[in-house]
Regions:
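Membrane-proximal envelope and lipid/glycan-remodeling enzymes
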Residues: 1-344
Length: 344
């Protein structure tokens, strides 16, 4: 909460506030007394696994591989530890993840443009930078069109798909307009979400060039891709730095992203590139976290790649990397949340 004109305001965007209104109503009715962060995190995790399981139907038939890949985004990545902490920023990332995978499901597997738009609104309502992925969803909604199609065919396809695009946009545009009004009412600017109003935040050294800056890119690259683990003299002999480490070290399964194939390869890599650029420009690469928590919003697009570029049946390399990834993230969860081994 930040002070302003004799009041206190949340620095979370409107979508994030609305996401937890049901919990607030339960507190108001005295059904619960404290914010059930870990219960909400568990609900997000369960629903996300369900949608990942359903999304696998796009390009796979193996039940074993379907189960493994549905579990991987939660238990084989930094989502497990960060979401498991139940903090407000982590819950917002969890809602964004759920919104993205739900939007992909209702776009690609069971086309329901209005529901896809509702989930997309949930996603960018919790992480504003996800608005950058909107053109990718538009592309997925508008396809398919044959490679040899003429401009006439393209215009005909656009007219045919336009109603679906409009249904998709109803809730996101509504939320966007309400968010602009919400920001203006609090801080007299539709673009001011309030983060810069946190006392002394702009005095922190990593924000000297602003909340977002190209100067922040090298540090974010270091944290996201190259930061390693620490060590200690007793079992398990290594421990994790509390301010980030490489997503590929924390989840070796991600090395499989670079295999060839997949029907949605271009769309997925485009979304990953757009979102990663926005994340790398953030002055602070995540603060207290395991691995690179911002990259949680990349996982649904990584999932599309992994589903499409792998074998039809479960392979030994996939099982091996899955086991290693789950072990690393399970250990991280234990060290971060159940022990006092992790220190600044």
């Amino acid at each position: 909460m930040v002070p302003g004109e004799g009041r206190y305001y949340s620095v979370f965007p409107l979508g994030a506030v609305l996401s937890v209104v049901p919990v607030a109503l339960l507190q108001k009715a005295n059904v619960i007394h404290d914010f059930p962060g870990r219960a909400v995190a568990a609900l997000i995790a369960g629903l996300s696994v369900y949608f990942f399981f359903q999304l696998f139907a796009l390009e796979g038939k193996s039940l074993g591989r379907r189960i493994l890949l549905a579990l991987f985004p939660i238990f084989g990545t930094w989502v497990w530890c960060n979401l498991g902490s139940g903090g407000a920023w982590h819950i917002a990332l969890g809602f964004a993840l759920l919104g993205e995978v739900g939007a992909l499901y209702f776009t690609l597997v069971r086309p329901r443009p209005f529901l896809a738009g509702a989930f997309f609104a949930l996603a960018f309502g919790n992480r504003t930078e996800l608005i950058l992925s909107a053109p990718v969803y538009f592309y997925l909604l508008m396809r398919p069109i044959d490679a040899g199609a003429t401009w006439t065919d393209a215009r005909r396809n656009l007219r045919a798909k336009l109603p679906a695009l409009i249904r998709f946009l109803i809730l996101p545009i509504t939320l966007g307009l309400l968010t602009a009004a919400y920001n203006f009412a609090r801080f007299h600017s539709i673009f001011d979400f309030g983060y810069s109003h946190i006392p002394n935040v702009l005095l922190e050294p990593w924000y000297q060039s602003g909340l977002f800056s190209l100067h922040a890119i090298p540090w974010n690259i270091q944290k996201m891709l190259f930061e390693g683990f620490g060590d200690m003299p007793s079992f398990p002999y290594f421990r994790f730095y509390p301010f980030g480490c490489s997503i590929f070290l924390s989840s070796p399964f991600l090395f499989l992203l670079f295999r060839e194939g997949g029907a949605y390869k271009s769309a997925a890599w485009t979304a990953i590139a757009l979102l990663t650029f926005a994340l790398w420009c953030h002055g602070n690469p995540g603060g207290w976290q395991f691995s690179y928590r911002y990259a949680i919003i990349l996982i649904p697009w990584m999932f599309l790649l992994l589903v499409g570029n792998g074998p039809t049946q479960l392979s030994t390399i996939e099982v091996s990397l899955f086991v290693v990834s789950v072990a690393i993230n399970g250990l991280a969860m234990y060290e971060f949340l159940w022990t006092n081994q992790i220190h600044p």
